[in-house]
């Protein structure tokens, strides 16, 4: 098991073999990695992970959303990132939120929001569409609007996830 000290965005990208497009945020798609061991990380960032294994979902409803807060230790077992699109999400450093509306609201989100169950196709599409929008903004040249736009997308995604977890 990869057991790091404090996991940063850059360290996470290096561990998973992804390029760091922005020092304060990264997209997670563990289906595109060459990991050969479990990941155990103490985070210095916020995050939202979405896990969906289409094969297992039919059998046991293994699908979840999880909010991550700085200081949490997160484990991602190897078998969770062996299927296409099974573990995706976004990780973002608190500094990304500076001078955005989300900076003041982030602490209002539940510290332990994790929903397990089957999401509807519509709910899955909302999650993947929001993640795609964040990823597209990361590929745009960084300018003075970048953090605000990304934070807005993250806030929308978090609000939807809270809704889905409370249904």
Task: Say what each PLM segment does.
Residues 1-21:
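A short, N-terminal "cap"/entry segment at the start of jelly-roll beta-barrel domains
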Residues 21-112, 143, 147:
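N-terminal regulatory/effector-sensing and dimerization cores
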Residues 12-15, 99-100, 122:
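Surface-exposed loop/turn and secondary-structure junction residues enriched for glycine/proline
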Residues 14-17, 102, 132, 136-139:
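Generic surface-pattern signal
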Residues 49, 165-167:
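Short, intrinsically disordered, charge-balanced linker/junction segments flanking boundaries
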